[in-house]
A protein has these predicted regions:
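Conserved ATP-driven motor cores of ASCE-family P-loop NTPases powering translocation/secretion/packaging/pilus
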Residues: 324-422
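P-loop NTPase motor domains
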Residues: 2-31, 36-40, 44-332, 378, ...
């Protein structure tokens, strides 16, 4: 007896994909040549184990097509390697990285936090945001030291406030400011903070320092503890972050530099680089999603191995999934490349799986090379969808009748994932 395979179980000869602004040539596991479309304004999540060519085969080429197709788009690149810099870096582009010797001087982004604060719409909010990132890791493990760390954070904000309010003509470089603070005694820091009346209540509350009776102030153990935690954060300023420069994200957004901005993440200096990278990436995201930004140039964020900022059990939440879910209407597009869905948990506060799973809704375009872990395969099967499939069950006896069972199954099976090239 001959049993034909139902039409519902036969695969289409070619995938039905929408047309994009360009395409990338690729080959399916069965040898079929296809054109993978590159869509403007659509976020893309690319997954696959190490060495499958995620960056070289798709992400780089997709970024090139999108940037070439619209000269107004600004590019933001994050990478641990140097693939994007080798291909897209031109004369006036800027590179934010720890090691100043690794980048040509004309391309090095040397930040100036005082100038950045002055250019913000709300300087007070900008100071708090910068301090939040710099003190985040201390506060996460604060326990009984939280009060002293919070006081050190308030002190750091007070120093920035004094410079911005009392010395309006000065954009003190990071190097000059940090080295001066490291040399100052506790008494000198308190006297400096007292120059700004807006700091007086903070001095009294956190330090027990009354500016009207400054000569009667006696240093307590609490004062030295606050100074200790402040110094810990000051030690984070090194490399290019402790140089005297004039560069700001505001100036790049305003078109004063080149078209592209590169975040070159150095794993050897991860503890120092992480808070600054998170601060600047969040600043770009907030600018694009702000209702006060008006009409501005679209931004393409090309993020390769962004989850490497979470190595060592640290989270790296700067609002990626908020940007993915809301950025389309504001002209923000994201190309995200990673090895595993599980790695993305670190991009949410406290490794929150629910935020990450919900954030995947912001990536309607999925490109899968060979996945290497069950969590990623299961997630992709869910995202690609399921359908009813017919199974013919042959009888054990030749006298029996075959039966047809209809079951809900993923459109992409584990066998098909395994057939992808390693």
């Amino acid at each position: 007896m001959f049993y034909d395979i139902p039409a519902t179980m036969k695969k289409e000869e070619a995938p039905q994909w929408p047309e994009g602004v360009g395409s990338i040539q690729a080959t399916l596991p069965d040898g079929m040549a296809v054109e993978v479309p590159v869509l403007k304004g659509t976020n893309v999540l690319t997954l696959g184990v190490v060495g499958t060519g995620k960056t070289k085969s798709f992400t780089e080429n997709a970024a090139d097509i999108l940037l070439s197709g619209d000269p107004d788009i600004k590019g933001v690149f994050f990478e641990v390697k140097h693939s994007f810099m080798d291909r897209f870096l031109v004369n006036n582009d800027k590179v934010l990285t720890y090691d100043s010797e690794a980048i040509p001087e004309k391309n090095l982004f040397v930040p100036n936090m005082i100038k950045e604060i002055r250019q913000a719409n709300d300087s007070e909010a900008e100071m708090r945001e910068l301090a939040d990132f710099l003190f985040a890791e201390l506060l996460n493990g604060a326990n009984q030291n939280r009060a002293w760390i919070q006081a050190a954070r308030n002190t750091f904000i007070g120093i920035l406030r004094t410079i911005v309010d009392c010395f309006p003509g000065e954009n003190t470089g990071n190097g000059t400011l940090i080295h001066a603070l490291r040399r100052m005694t506790t008494g000198e820091i308190l006297a400096y903070l007292a120059k700004n009346p807006r700091n007086h209540s903070m001095l009294l509350k956190d330090w027990g320092y009354d500016v009207h009776y400054a000569e009667e102030f006696k240093f307590t153990r609490r004062a030295y503890d606050i100074q200790f935690f402040l110094n810990q954060v000051l030690e984070n300023f090194s490399g290019s972050f402790a140089m005297n420069g004039t560069d700001t994200i505001h100036d790049w957004l305003a078109g004063k530099y080149g078209r592209n901005l590169f975040f070159r993440y150095d794993l050897a200096s991860a503890e120092i680089s992480r808070p600054f990278f998170l601060y600047y990436m969040k600043k770009i995201k907030d600018y694009k999603l702000s209702n006060t930004a008006g009409t501005s140039a679209p931004i393409l964020m090309v993020l390769d191995e962004l989850d490497k900022m979470t190595d060592g059990g640290k989270t790296a939440d700067w609002g990626l999934f908020q940007a993915a879910n809301l950025g389309r209407e504001y002209g923000l597009q994201i190309l995200l490349t990673t090895q595993s869905v599980s790695n993305l948990y670190g991009l949410s506060t406290d490794f929150n799986e629910h935020i990450t799973s919900g954030g995947l809704a912001g990536f309607p375009y999925l490109v899968s090379f060979r996945p290497g872990d069950p969590e990623t395969i299961s997630t992709l099967q869910t995202l690609y969808g399921s359908d009813y499939r017919e199974h013919i069950i042959f009888p054990a006896s030749r006298y029996g009748e075959p039966t047809v069972r209809c079951e809900m199954e993923p459109l992409v099976t584990e066998v098909e994932f395994a057939s992808l090239e390693p």
